[in-house]
Amino acid sequence: MDQDRVPFSNTEPFRFCPADGTELEAKGGESRGAACPTCGRSWYRSSAPAVGAAIVDGERVLVTVRGIEPEKGRLDLPGGFVEVGEHPRDALAREAREELGVEVEVEQRPMLLAVHTYGPDGEYVLAMGFRVRIVSGEPNPADDVAKFRWVAADEIDGLDFAWEHDRRIARQALEDG
């Protein structure tokens, strides 16, 4: 898929105005939104924010094997989508509990912000990577994680990451340690 092409129309996911039910019209220009010709409100399809945890233990970082599509069987970092109204740090803690059964502490501000596409339709995602440490529990794969492993800095470049930004986050977390 052409990474520069937006894989949806200006009006998706809205076809009708949520306020009054009028069929929406694509806005012109750069906005890529949809407008209601009756009430004048604008609607936008937004990129989904996601978080990734570079869980560090000394000279190693934890990577997971995806148990589900997209990219099943490939490596990534624990994490996932931020829910509506959820702070990214809270999303990170929730994802670590869901995927590994551990409690984590975020050690710093986001290390990396990256825009990438996710899934077969190429939906855009804004990913935020954080360096974290486990404060309680032992990692145990759950949810969409098939298994995990600890890797050293010299192994990172040879691994099959699903998304390149996860490789950069893992590498930077060990360099910053």
Task: Give names to the regions the model predicted.
Residues 1-13, 112-113, 170-177:
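A broadly conserved sequence feature marking short terminus-proximal activation segments
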Residues 6-52:
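Acidic, metal-coordinating catalytic segment for phosphate/diphosphate chemistry
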Residues 55, 63, 132-134, 150:
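Conserved hydrophobic "DFG−1" position in protein kinase catalytic cores
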Residues 101-138:
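Active-site segment of metal-dependent pyrophosphate-handling enzymes
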